[in-house]
């Protein structure tokens, strides 16, 4: 199994993001929200939205992105073929790395279940 985070596993264009924002299933916490939408590919893809308004410092934004990408990279083979967008909230920077990963795992699992309706 390959655990890299190649270009094909990323949302790259504004159209990709728009389609997820338009019709998405949500899983959220006080620290961040994950939006998910089925895609027509055979693998999941990840997009990140980390506004400067929410996390002020570049160090904080980069940490958020790094931890989220690493979690996605490790879980990619157990995730369904969906496009995921992770949106940061202010309180995300207060989480320890361990708590951040636990919360991400919980939300990945919630979004991996078949949708009802």
Swiss-Prot record:
Pfam families: Ribonuclease_P. Keywords: Endonuclease, Hydrolase, Nuclease, RNA-binding, tRNA processing. It comes from the Bacteria. GO terms for cellular component: ribonuclease P complex. It catalyses: Endonucleolytic cleavage of RNA, removing 5'-extranucleotides from tRNA precursor. The keyword Chloroplast does not apply. One of its GO terms (molecular function) is tRNA binding. One of its GO terms (biological process) is tRNA 5'-leader removal. PROSITE patterns: RIBONUCLEASE_P. InterPro entries: Ribosomal_Su5_D2-typ_SF, Ribsml_uS5_D2-typ_fold_subgr, RNase_P, RNase_P_CS. Gene3D superfamilies: 3.30.230.10. Its EC number is 3.1.26.5. Consists of a catalytic RNA component (M1 or rnpB) and a protein subunit. HAMAP family: RNase_P. Belongs to the RnpA family. RNaseP catalyzes the removal of the 5'-leader sequence from pre-tRNA to produce the mature 5'-terminus. It can also cleave other RNA substrates such as 4.5S RNA. The protein component plays an auxiliary but essential role in vivo by binding to the 5'-leader sequence and broadening the substrate specificity of the ribozyme. This is Ribonuclease P protein component. It comes from Aliivibrio salmonicida (strain LFI1238) (Vibrio salmonicida (strain LFI1238)).
